[in-house]
Amino acid sequence: MPRRGYVPKREVLPDPKYQSKLVSKLINVIMEDGKKSISEKICYGAFEIIKEKTGQDPLKVFKQAIENIKPVLEVRPRRVGGATYQVPMEVRPNRRLSLALRWLTTYARQRKEKTMKERLAGEILDAYNNVGSSIKKREETHKMAEANRAFAHYRW
């Protein structure tokens, strides 16, 4: 066991444009190689596209999209007497958010649109409308948990 003290998690500062910690986290997840200004341009550009397409507040659309992506259950491996079982467990709130943001950006990168702004906007709008790859991933995760419900008593 490590003997060092507990290191507190650093608080994420809200982004300058929308004053939202959620947007700030999205920017950090999009960021590659420490290039934050580029990820900010991508994020804000995607929000502009969302505003043009829906005519609604892009922050509200984004928040609803994230709520739609968040998984409730997931399976985690657990070894019991030489066999590894996939045990369904409830996802902690902070992990729900990080998984949702990660899935959103991962599947946005895999889309066919020309620029990352368009891809991200498309994926957010799809998630808002309960369709798209990130929603499919959540459903897949829930299906796995449901299929392994018999092992739920192995929870720890």
Swiss-Prot record:
Keywords: Ribonucleoprotein, Ribosomal protein, RNA-binding, rRNA-binding, tRNA-binding. One of its GO terms (cellular component) is ribosome. Part of the 30S ribosomal subunit. Contacts proteins S9 and S11. InterPro entries: Ribosomal_uS7, Ribosomal_uS7_bac/org-type, Ribosomal_uS7_CS, Ribosomal_uS7_dom, Ribosomal_uS7_dom_sf. This is Small ribosomal subunit protein uS7. PROSITE patterns: RIBOSOMAL_S7 (PS00052). CDD domains: uS7_Bacteria (cd14869). Belongs to the universal ribosomal protein uS7 family. One of the primary rRNA binding proteins, it binds directly to 16S rRNA where it nucleates assembly of the head domain of the 30S subunit. Is located at the subunit interface close to the decoding center, probably blocks exit of the E-site tRNA. GO terms for biological process: ribosomal small subunit assembly; translation. One of its GO terms (molecular function) is mRNA binding.
